[in-house]
Amino acid sequence: MMHGDTEGVIPGNALVVDPKKQFRPLSKFGNAFLNRFQCSTVDSPVLKGISIVDSPGILSGEKQRTDRGYEFTGVLEWFAERVDRIILLFDAHKLDISDEFRRSIEALRGHDDKIRIILNKVSHFQFIAV
C-alpha cells in the first residue's frame, strides 16, 4: 500500500514496468510471483512518508508442501534490504516453527535491527503475575 493521487489497485506486472516505481527488480521472480503481487494506492497524507508491505503468511504443516511457484525467501530478502522496519506478526496460539518459517528467518538475517515481533491474540492467555 502506498500513496497515490487516486485509490486503486495496480497489478504486479504493471508495477515492474513502471519507471516511476521501485519494483522493476522484482520481475526476476517471474509471473507466478507477479500474478500475486499488487499495490493498493490511497490518497492519504499518512502514506506520503511510508509504504506498507504485507506478505502472505508463512506456510506450516501440510500447506508448506505446496509450492508457491516463486522464491518466497528471495522476495523477503529483496524487501528486507530496502525497508526501515520489519514487523513479524504471530498468532500466539500457533507458534509453529515450520521449514518455511526457518528459511524465512534465515532470509531476514542481517536485518535484526529492523525486526519487531508482535504476538497476536495474546489476550486469550491467562498471565500469572510474578
Q: Which residues are covered by each model-predicted region?
A:
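Switch- and interface-adjacent substructures of P-loop NTPase systems
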Residues: 1-116, 125-126
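GTPase G-domain guanine-specificity segment
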Residues: 122-130
